[in-house]
């Protein structure tokens, strides 16, 4: 599962922004209301940021058609300061900024909730308008409007699916921002990209991979004994608890590598069922197959199987033990009523991949060495000025601070050249 990654500490963010909020005029809320498509402006408790409703077409090819309100979060500093454009891939509930906020000193933070997530869901809901292009058009409308107020440098950034959002935006609107920093964002080239399974067969060392597989087989062999120990509510599993359990076992290695689990924590296959259950619960991959989990990520799964791409499971070693789920497919996680109608569009990511390799300027790609999603990291061929940093030993938490000093120097010198300003080294 492509996880939600949040950028920045909310406590530190509120303190920092409260201290500099006076740098903008008291009538900012009124100015925001004059921007095109801004429908509501609500100041958050404490007054450090604004929750903004921005009207968007559901289908940007029909701008006069159905509309919906997209939620934005603005933490302002000054009109001439840089703007960090946080491109969320999921829901959002506050301004972000992450490590870039510290590097840029006192930037404005503008975070955009992705369409079809959180409070930014059209009604009535038609899934066919949840496309990469429509989401990029959303970003373009927002940037165009807010540039009427904010004249400094603009930097788009996001992590995981949010990093994908930043990259897709770059491909369709290359001149809207001055730089793009994408964290741990895969660029898949198929509905079920085979490179991900190959990565899972080679990541780490053989001993660790063997231990993970033995653990999975033990979980399946003792399924009937372990499920009662999980204390799950069957009412939350419409697909059936046993089927969800087996999905969670198949998903386990992806969660293991994505979140940097230590192999020494894995029980031996002959451990007690209580020990096996405890470790399985710790990674919690079964949640994604519960009704709340499916609902939370259904929009992502729709995107995955129509445009963004995902992965399948190599079940060769597990097939004898899959009693409730003999033919697993993650399309089971797509929105109700869409599974049999989904058609994958290979042209979208083919365009994105080609554009990023041959045309995209001022882009930083950051990946973690052992992150499962590094399997489909962007491959650069030297045709643009883009740089890529793969952080040794890092997983889905990879960032510049964890990179080597040489990699940090490359990042800072490159960004300073692109932005024409000095960055604070954190």
What is each stretch, according to the model?
Residues 158-162, 166, 170:
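Gly/Ala-rich beta-loop-alpha elbow adjacent to hydrolase catalytic centers
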Residues 168-302:
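Alpha/beta-hydrolase
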Residues 258-426:
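C-terminal subdomain of alpha/beta-hydrolase-fold enzymes, centered on the catalytic histidine
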Residues 23-108, 413, 417-426:
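Catalytic-loop region of hydrolases
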């Amino acid at each position: 599962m492509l996880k939600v990654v949040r950028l920045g500490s909310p406590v530190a963010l509120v303190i920092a922004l409260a201290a500099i909020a006076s740098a903008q005029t008291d009538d900012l809320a009124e100015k925001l209301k004059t921007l095109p498509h801004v429908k509501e402006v609500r100041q958050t408790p404490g007054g450090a940021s604004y929750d903004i409703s921005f009207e968007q077409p559901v289908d940007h090819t029909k701008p006069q058609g159905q509309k919906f309100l997209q939620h934005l979060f603005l933490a302002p500093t000054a009109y001439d300061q840089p703007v960090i454009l946080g491109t969320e891939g999921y829901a959002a509930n506050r301004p972000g900024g992450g490590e870039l906020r510290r590097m840029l000193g006192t930037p404005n933070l503008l975070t955009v909730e992705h369409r079809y997530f959180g409070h930014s869901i059209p009604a009535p809901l038609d899934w066919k308008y949840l496309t990469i292009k429509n989401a990029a058009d959303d970003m373009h409308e927002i940037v165009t409007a807010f540039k009427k107020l904010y004249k400094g440098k603009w930097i788009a950034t996001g992590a995981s699916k949010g990093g994908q959002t930043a990259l897709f935006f770059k491909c369709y609107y290359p001149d809207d921002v001055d730089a793009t920093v994408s964290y741990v964002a895969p660029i898949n080239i198929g509905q079920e990209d085979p490179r991900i399974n190959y990565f899972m067969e080679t990541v780490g060392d053989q001993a660790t991979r063997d231990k993970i597989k033995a653990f999975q087989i033990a979980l399946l062999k003792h399924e009937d004994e372990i499920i009662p120990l999980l204390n799950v509510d069957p009412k939350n599993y419409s697909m059936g608890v046993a089927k969800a359990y087996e999905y969670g076992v198949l998903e386990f290695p992806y969660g293991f590598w994505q979140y940097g689990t230590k192999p020494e924590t894995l029980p031996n296959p002959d451990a007690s069922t209580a020990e096996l259950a405890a470790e399985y619960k710790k990674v919690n991959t079964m949640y994604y197959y519960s009704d709340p989990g499916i609902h939370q990520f259904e929009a992502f799964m729709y995107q995955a199987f129509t445009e963004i791409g995902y992965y399948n499971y190599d079940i060769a070693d597990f097939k004898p033990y899959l009693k409730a789920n003999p033919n697993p497919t993650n399309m089971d996680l797509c929105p109700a009523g869409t599974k049999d109608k989904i058609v994958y569009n290979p042209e979208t990511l083919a365009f994105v991949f080609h554009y990023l390799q041959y045309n995209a300027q001022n882009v930083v790609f950051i990946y973690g060495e052992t992150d499962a999603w590094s399997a489909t990291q962007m491959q650069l061929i030297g045709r643009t000025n883009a740089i890529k940093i793969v952080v040794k030993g890092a997983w889905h938490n990879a960032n510049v601070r964890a990179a080597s000093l040489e990699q940090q120097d490359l990042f800072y010198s490159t960004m300073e050249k692109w932005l024409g300003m000095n960055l604070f080294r954190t």
